[in-house]
Curated annotation (Swiss-Prot):
InterPro entries: Class_I_gatase-like (IPR029062), CTP_synthase (IPR004468), CTP_synthase_N (IPR017456), GATASE (IPR017926), GATase1_CTP_Synthase (IPR033828), P-loop_NTPase (IPR027417). The gene is pyrG. It is an enzyme of class 6 (ligase). It catalyses: UTP + L-glutamine + ATP + H2O = CTP + L-glutamate + ADP + phosphate + 2 H(+); L-glutamine + H2O = L-glutamate + NH4(+); UTP + NH4(+) + ATP = CTP + ADP + phosphate + 2 H(+). Homotetramer. This is CTP synthase.
Length: 535
């Protein structure tokens, strides 16, 4: 029978529930269990696709095209699995589904209420995740903080699940904070006690408490928490700030967290073999070289907006025993006069994805600098589109060339709407989303990176390269190294007389793993290291 683990949070948000859930998933997978994982977000948006990155951070796209929470990126990178649309559930999705059922008459004239209809829909999403993946264990992270009004239906639903399928098949893990009061010189357990009290008042008794802390938690403090929260002392798990996220699974294993979980759920799988993971962490902690990459974006104040990009750069660096330092460059501040000052000390330049016109001209200036000064360049999504526009303006001399997204009246729409997008009015969930094939041209940097004729990558865009400009740009040295299999859509572009200048319409960062870097990132970092060594 499938086992279910629920991870909740208390006291404050951003405690690392997602990393805790992902780390536990890795430990259980290494015990030979088939693990899947999901995130429940209590906001009323159907998905984060139209939310500002300042509000939500990065939008992570799954193979099947779901726009999801950035925690799914952590899940995939840690557990090394590909998740799907069932892995992220929001209040908006739940209510939308229930209202559609009501309109179809599925409730037989009954009064539709939070209990049982909303809670039943939530439970169905939990069970479906296990069914669709044939999982031994389903880990579900509940977003928000215990005590929030928005979270109540989710907490009630997961309370009911224990009654539905039995205590041996359900486990609750609660993540809290033990703050250190500098003035008093002591750590305080009271916020954790009150958070657990709130959770218990809702009918949920946590089996494990994971306490986030800056300093070591004494045995006396663990005993106190165990007494007041009614759990075993060994089930108080310390989550200290780590020098690398990838060390967290090893810290949890040292405290026997995965064994406690298996004992409670009556799973007799052998201990997790973390030899390879330990080797990875040791490598990360002992990188001997450095390279600096400029990330030119418009959300640089909130680095979570580009979290998968940064992780993909780091993964690539691990292959070369290199610590990749990211220099955050606000695209709105970049001009032709100061671009050298802002990016001249870096070994490579990356322009990530985005929407809208803010910061676009600054990104184009940075791309021009990379092209003219032979600096390794990687463009992603909008970065690929702007690389095309920069070439059209400054090499072909098409003054005013632009994207019809940025300037609908441009005389040269190098980037235009996909034909199937012309009549689309809704913004949410209507992009070209998910995994699509890309055919690679031989004897190109793209082909050399993948060493395969056809690859599959995840997309999230509405605009595409305008094919009427293809012949002129090819004549001028612009290489279309990746297209859709029918040749209609441009997927990857690069330059002929440049050491390494590649840009992709898709989002390669989404499939990178710490032990398996994404090929374009791998070769981009390699080219950046070579550039540094040649200076």
């Amino acid at each position: 029978m499938t086992k279910y683990i629920f991870v909740t949070g208390g006291v404050v948000s951003s405690l690392g529930k997602g990393i805790t859930a992902a780390s536990l998933g890795r430990l259980l997978k290494n015990r030979g269990l088939n693990v899947t994982i999901q995130k429940f977000d209590p906001y009323i948006n159907v998905d984060p696709g139209t939310m500002s990155p300042y509000q939500h951070g990065e939008v992570f796209v799954t193979d099947d095209g779901a726009e999801t929470d950035l925690d799914l990126g952590h899940y995939e990178r840690f557990i090394d699995i590909n998740l799907n649309k069932y892995s992220n559930v929001t209040t908006g999705k739940i209510y939308s589904s229930v209202l559609q059922k009501e309109r179809r008459g599925e409730y037989l004239g009954g009064t539709v209420q939070v209990i049982p209809h909303i809670t039943n829909e939530i439970k169905e999403r939990v069970y479906r995740s296990g069914r669709e993946t044939n999982a031994d264990v389903v880990i579900t992270e509940i977003g928000g903080t215990v005590g929030d009004i928005e979270s109540l239906p989710f907490l009630e639903a997961i309370r009911q699940i224990k009654s539905d399928i039995g205590r041996d098949n359900v486990m609750y893990i609660h993540c809290t904070l033990i703050p250190y009061l500098k003035a008093a010189g002591e750590m305080k357990t009271k916020p954790t006690q009150h958070s657990v009290k709130e959770l218990r008042s809702l009918g949920i008794q946590p089996n494990i408490i994971v306490v986030r802390t800056e300093l070591p938690v004494s045995q006396d403090m663990k005993d106190k928490l165990a007494l007041f929260c009614d759990i075993d002392t060994k089930a108080v798990i310390e989550a200290r700030d780590a020098d690398t996220l990838y060390a967290v699974p090893l810290s949890l294993q040292e405290q026997n967290m995965d064994q406690i979980v298996c004992d409670h759920l009556k799973l007799d799988n052998p201990a997790a073999d973390m030899t390879d993971w330990t080797a990875l962490v040791n490598k990360v902690r002992n990188l001997s070289k450095k390279t600096k990459i400029a990330l030119v974006g418009k959300y640089v104040e909130l680095q979570d907006a580009y979290i998968s990009v940064v992780e993909a750069l780091r993964h690539a660096g691990y292959s070369f025993d290199t610590d990749v330092e990211v220099k955050w460059v606000n695209a709105e501040h970049v001009t032709a006069e100061n671009v050298k000052e802002l990016v001249g000390d870096t070994d490579g330049i990356l322009v990530p994805g985005g929407f809208g016109d803010r910061g676009v001209e600054g990104k184009i200036v940075a791309i021009q600098y990379a092209r003219e000064n032979k600096v390794p360049f990687l463009g992603i999504c909008l970065g690929m589109q702007l690389a095309s526009i920069e070439f059209a303006r400054n090499v072909l001399g098409l003054e005013g060339a632009n994207s019809s997204e940025i300037n609908p009246d441009t005389p040269y729409a190098i980037i235009d709407l996909l034909p199937e997008q012309k009549d689309v009015e809704d913004l949410g969930g209507t992009l070209r989303l998910g995994l699509y094939p890309c055919k690679l041209a031989e004897e190109t940097n793209a082909y050399n990176a993948y060493n395969e004729p056809v690859v599959y990558e995840r997309h999230r865009h509405r605009y595409e390269f305008n094919n009427q400009f293809r012949p002129d740009m090819e004549k001028a040295g612009f290489v279309f190294s990746g297209t859709s299999p029918d040749g209609r859509l441009v997927e990857i572009i690069e330059l002929q007389d440049h050491p390494w200048f590649v840009a992709a319409q898709f989002h390669p960062e989404l499939v990178s793993r710490p032990n398996r870097p994404q090929p374009l990132f791998h070769d981009f970092v390699s080219a950046s290291i070579t550039n540094k060594e040649s200076k």
